[in-house]
C-alpha cells in the first residue's frame, strides 16, 4: 500500500477529530503527523474562535509524554493537577487554556503515523473508558485510511 497523504486522508482525519471530540466529551482535538522527530499539525477541531497549534511543529524529544505514547503505542492521559505531570506538556496545556489531555498514537499502514491529542477545558481527567472509545474511533479511521 502507498502511504495516504492526499486530501481524502485530510478529510478523513478532520471527520475523525470531530467524532473524537463528541465521542469522549472533549473540547478540542488535534491530529498531527510524525515525521522523524517532528510533529506537524494536520487538522484540529477547536471551540469556535479558538486556534490551537496554528501550524506549529513540535520536536518530539522535547515532550517526554508524547515520546512515550509514540514509542509504546499506548495512550496516556494527564491533567494539570497531576503530581507527575510532564512539565513540557503542562506548559502547552496552560498556553492553550486547557486542563486535561489525552494522547493516542495513530496507526496507518501498520505503523505509527501520527498523534491525536484530545483536550478538556475543565480538569475532568480522561479515563480508561475515554481511552477505549477514542481507540475504537481511531481503529475505524485507520482501517478506512488503509482501505
Positions of predicted regions on the chain:
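Signal-transducing coiled-coil linker helices
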Residues: 1-16
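GAF sensory/regulatory domain recognition
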Residues: 18-19, 30-54
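Short N-terminal helix-loop-first-beta-strand/juxtamembrane motif that initiates sensory/input modules
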Residues: 23-29
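Short hydrophobic/aromatic beta-strand element in the GNAT-like acyltransferase core
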Residues: 28, 90, 103, 115
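Regulatory sensory and allosteric helical modules in signal-transduction proteins
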Residues: 34, 51-91
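Sensory-domain boundary capping and coupling elements
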Residues: 66, 106-120
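A short, aliphatic-rich beta-strand micro-motif
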Residues: 99-107
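Regulatory loop-to-helix N-cap segments in sensory/regulatory domains
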Residues: 119-137, 144-146
